[in-house]
Amino acid sequence: MNTRIEHIHKLGVDIGRVIISPVKDGKSDTAFLSGGIEQALQTPPAEGAIERLTRLVEVFEGRVWLVSKAGKNTQHKTRLWLAHHRFFERTGMSAHHLRFCFKRHEKAGHCVELGLTHFVDDRLDVLRHLQGLAPHLYLFGEQLKSQSAPDWVEPTLNWDETFTAICRSLD
């Protein structure tokens, strides 16, 4: 009898400031949150996000979910942005793998329900809620200099670093 248990890897990814770029033309871009729908749609994807997520969808055999904290208005803008940029078609990710919550700590419930093993977020306060739930946590993007990453997260500055770190964890 084979008693070996295969561990199925599953990835969760935040949207704002991770997939949707926080910077436009070298400046902080707040148009997605504070502007109208047309401005939000013009916000580009983060550099390398589409390409690297396309590969991660393949590596994780489709077990990739978007998990975002957003109010009703931002949820609507996010859905429109994903459609406008043909996100699901371009990455191969299932459009049914989109989850929203109203409070940051609620991402933990999605993490448990989906059995996520890896999670990428730009906020340390979110990742604190996932500590002990997903074994591989990635703090994405530039952080405040006064905020050093604890040893239970892996800081990654961009999608190239994130992709490399995630793939390394699968070896």
Feature map (PLM): residue ranges:
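Short acidic, S/G/P-rich loop/turn micro-motifs used as interaction or catalytic elements
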Residues: 19-20, 72-73, 126
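Acidic-and-aromatic substrate-binding clefts and catalytic sites of carbohydrate-active enzymes
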Residues: 41-45, 72-74, 102
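Substrate-recognition element of Asp-dependent hydrolases with the DxDx(T/V) motif
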Residues: 49-82
